Regions:
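Metal-ion/cofactor- or nucleotide/acyl-coenzyme-handling active-site neighborhoods
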Residues: 70, 75-79, 86, 125-136
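Thiamine diphosphate
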Residues: 1-74, 83-104, 221
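Flexible, low-complexity linker and terminal segments
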Residues: 96, 101-223
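Short, surface-exposed, polar/charged, turn-prone segments marking secondary-structure boundaries
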Residues: 26-27, 48-52, 74-78, 111-114, ...
Length: 223
């Protein structure tokens, strides 16, 4: 399928209770930006692997570059939280992939894994990695009959239900919506929902299961 369909299929997987990741590069990601923005407004987890290559345009499609950080950081119309992980080694790539799914599920936000062509073309044997044999249980709830997908929450994180798991309807919509998921243009609801979504920026910074770390020299500009 094309990139537009791919990211929407991924969002459908998360909506149904699964775990999905899409992988692309350059212009392919440009086609995914509307789907990325959709993930932002419906507060859906999503994992996106963006393999950087030299642009603009087709650029140098078989060479390496690290020029897409701003693209990942600001892609998608409108303002919504996202996280970006950038592995520098194959070992870190495995770890980042695991953590990306945990972080996306915990924050109900898109999470990027940002790599470059050099890393993707690399290959060597690795020692056994301490990765779990099975993924953690998804953070979904059994819905009550009066379930509201976007219920107000102090940290911006509403309980995430999925269709068929409980008694409630799980409404999602790319238009602005109220707590129950119904389309609205009321200014006070718009302000409240924007503030709710942006609260998750603090959540992304402070999630205890994803401690801050720094790999590489303490001062990369001089070392």
């Amino acid at each position: 399928e094309d990139e537009i369909a791919a990211i929407n299929m991924g969002l459908g997987g998360w909506y149904a209770g699964g775990r999905a990741m899409v992988s692309t590069s350059g212009g392919g990601f440009a086609l995914m930006e509307e789907g990325l923005s959709l993930a932002g407004v419906i507060e859906s987890p999503m994992v996106i692997h963006l393999a950087q290559r030299p642009g603009p345009g087709t650029g140098l499609p078989t060479r390496t570059e690290q020029g897409d950080l701003d693209l990942a950081l600001y892609a998608g119309h409108g303002e919504f939280p996202r996280a970006i992980l950038a592995p520098g080694t194959l070992e870190e790539a495995f770890r980042c992939a695991e953590q990306a799914f945990i972080l996306a599920d915990a924050s109900q936000c898109p999470v990027f894994i940002l790599t470059d062509q050099y890393l993707l073309d690399s290959g060597h044997d690795l020692a056994a990695l301490p990765l779990p044999a099975t993924p953690p249980e998804p953070r979904i709830v059994a819905t009550e009959a009066d379930y509201q997908r976007y219920a107000a929450a102090e940290n911006g994180l509403s309980p995430r239900g999925i269709p068929g798991h409980g008694q409630g309807l799980v409404r999602v919509d790319s238009d602005e919506h109220d707590e129950a998921g119904f389309i609205t243009e009321r200014a006070e609801v718009r302000i409240a929902m924007m503030n709710k979504r942006l609260k998750k920026l603090a959540l992304l910074r402070d999630l205890p299961e994803f401690p801050h770390c720094w790999s590489g020299p303490a001062n990369p500009r001089s070392e």
